[in-house]
Amino acid sequence: MILRALLILLLLASCGRPLTEAEVEFLTDLNGGTIDTNRVRLVDGTPATAITFRRPARPRVTCRELILPPIEEKIVTGKPGAVALFNKVYVRKDLYLDDYMQGHPDDVSLLAVMFFAHEMIHVWQWQNRKQTGYHPLKAASEHGQGEDPYLFEIEDQTEFLDFGYEQQASIVEEYVCCRALDRDAPRTQRLHDMIAQSFPVARLDQNILGRAVRLPWDEVEVKGICGKA
């Protein structure tokens, strides 16, 4: 099934839009120029097959979970939000945007920027595969091991590249959330220091998101959201 999807994606290789100026600026700050943004394309739609699976209730201890309403464990059917293949990201139609930094520098959707950052890390993993050992099929194999590939725990001595590919993307997604809402928190600093082991992320005192972010849920308790290291 994976090989079939891979072939379909290759047939669509000529499709996709380039990154916007604001997206490039954000990525340059986030990744320190370690992504060749000219090669990146975002495609509206993914040929991935819908699957039925048990969606677990994730622990509400991270910024990326706390900005959303609680989710109950249940059986769901759906397609993945995106499929990253080399320098292309195929985005599910309901999540595709013409600009994930829309509104910058006045205000941006935090959820959109987090989603964009997550997927761009997969592009970074591919473009820097001599460092990461990445291949799309390796990343896909993480989804068939019975555990949630996106969950991670930060240990004192853990290196960024010690994590799985989806975990690395989730760590950067969490970092964007914490940097936006709780920049001075211990967790934000720990995430920053760990990510900086692998690429030159912008200093925490630099504003890479603009003047404000829009939250996806009215009941978010922002104060201390990343206070736990």
Positions of predicted regions on the chain:
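Post-signal peptide N-terminal segment of mature Sec-exported envelope proteins
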Residues: 22-51
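Metalloprotease/metallohydrolase-associated module, dominated by Zn2+-dependent proteases
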Residues: 22-28, 35, 84-86, 93, ...
